[in-house]
Every structure is written in structure tokens, then in C-alpha cells.
Amino acid sequence: MARSVVAALLVLLSLSGLEAIQHAPKIQVYSRHPAENGKPNYLNCYVSGFHPSDIEVDLLKNGQKIENVEHSDLSFSKDWSFYLLYYTEFTPNEKDEYACRVSHVTFPTPKTVKWDRNM
């Protein structure tokens, strides 16, 4: 009986330790197709390798939050870190700037990564 109690406590302690691990998200911003001015495309923000799972992701156009953004379900990798894809349809041009802003416990302030049309 005592062994099973000790084993159960060890399992609980190891599981609670997962929440203590924090990994900053890797942020990748890219378009589905090569950018062509005036041609509809999709803007993607792939956020991966983060822990814990609480995260806020916004796609931005000229610094303003884009509405009607879709995202994948929250998923996890073999190492128990999480990943998500946020995306929206957009039509690139020369004057507009697009970016992805991410808020996570590992960042003191939200981190913004700009879309590079040449990537």
C-alpha cells in the first residue's frame, strides 16, 4: 500500500513539473504562395515549440489587428511543446505592412514579427 501511494505521489509530482517548464515560441510569418501585388494569397503565422499552452496570436495589417483570422487546433509535439497556425486571406501590395504579434508568458512584452515578402 505504501509503495503505491509513493508511486502515485511521484507521478503527480512529475506531471505538475511539466507546468513549471517554460519554452518561448518560435514565430514564423510567411505567405502560402510567392507574393504578387494585387493577387489574393494567404498570410500564415506558425507558432511552435512553446510551453505552457496559454498564448495569444494576432495577425496585423499596418499595426492594426486583422479580424476574421482562422487558426488550427492547439497541438503538441513529441516533446510536449505546443504549436498553432493562424492564417487569413490577404492581397499584398507595395504599401501595406503585415506582421504577427504573439503574447506568451516567456515574453516580457508581446513580440511582433514582420512578414518578409521575399521569403
UniProtKB/Swiss-Prot annotation:
GO cellular component, one term: extracellular region
GO biological process: antigen processing and presentation of peptide antigen via MHC class I; immune response
Gene3D superfamilies for the chain: Immunoglobulins
Cross-referenced CDD domains: IgC1_beta2m
Assembly with partners or alone: Heterodimer of an alpha chain and a beta chain. Beta-2-microglobulin is the beta-chain of major histocompatibility complex class I molecules.
InterPro entries: B2Microglobulin, Ig-like_dom, Ig-like_dom_sf, Ig-like_fold, Ig/MHC_CS, Ig_C1-set, MHC/Immunoglobulin
Keyword terms, alphabetized: Disulfide bond, Immunity, Immunoglobulin domain, MHC I, Secreted, Signal
Family: Belongs to the beta-2-microglobulin family.
Cell compartment(s), UniProt: Secreted
Residues annotated as domain Ig-like C1-type: 25-114
SS bond partners: 45-100
Name of this chain's protein: Beta-2-microglobulin
Record's signal peptide: 1-20
Pfam families xrefs: C1-set (PF07654)
Function: Component of the class I major histocompatibility complex (MHC). Involved in the presentation of peptide antigens to the immune system.
Organism placement in taxonomy: Eukaryota, Metazoa, Chordata, Craniata, Vertebrata
